[in-house]
């Protein structure tokens, strides 16, 4: 049985970020982590753990969102691009009624910014977050920084995170270890 103080956070694993024709895709490197994410999500539920799916969401043409100036429109509410990618969508459809599976809309890089994630984790006495998904050097990184600042223990599954460039991936993994004291495995 799993220690009840850990949660898996599957961050932004959507069609727009992962599918070959996604609006802001990591492409093949993002697709390669799919089986690791599914394995960890299944393991988490088997061990009575928690799976949170903090997922980027945008409204088309929002002039006030800072990402509008940086990136093309992506993860628009109610679109295919915002749906989970591949096997994760199938996994979610199968497990969405499970009370230990929680989808969380987020509008910023960090899963903690402007959400009730911290309250949900603390209500469940969770003190450790295991992060997987995309993008390692953007949303995974910002979530990890906030988790660190909020006092959570951080685990990064190296085979479960991906980003646009090899340099970004390597830099972020080192930063997790050296600046946040995260366990990278």
Language model: regions and residue ranges:
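Acidic/polar short surface loop at catalytic or gating sites that assists cofactor/ion binding
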Residues: 60-78
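Short beta-strand segments at enzyme active-site cores
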Residues: 49-56
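Short acidic, Gly/Ser-rich segments with clustered Asp/Glu that frequently serve as metal-coordination loops
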Residues: 14-20
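N-terminal nucleotide-binding beta1-loop-alpha1 segment
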Residues: 7-13
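Loop-to-helix element that buttresses phosphate recognition and phosphoryl-transfer chemistry
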Residues: 27-39
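Short glycine-enriched, charge-decorated loop/helix-capping segments at active-site entrances
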Residues: 22-30, 69-75
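Active-site-adjacent betaalpha module
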Residues: 1-7, 36-47, 72-185
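Active-site loop signature of alpha/beta-hydrolase-fold enzymes
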Residues: 16, 59-60, 162-163
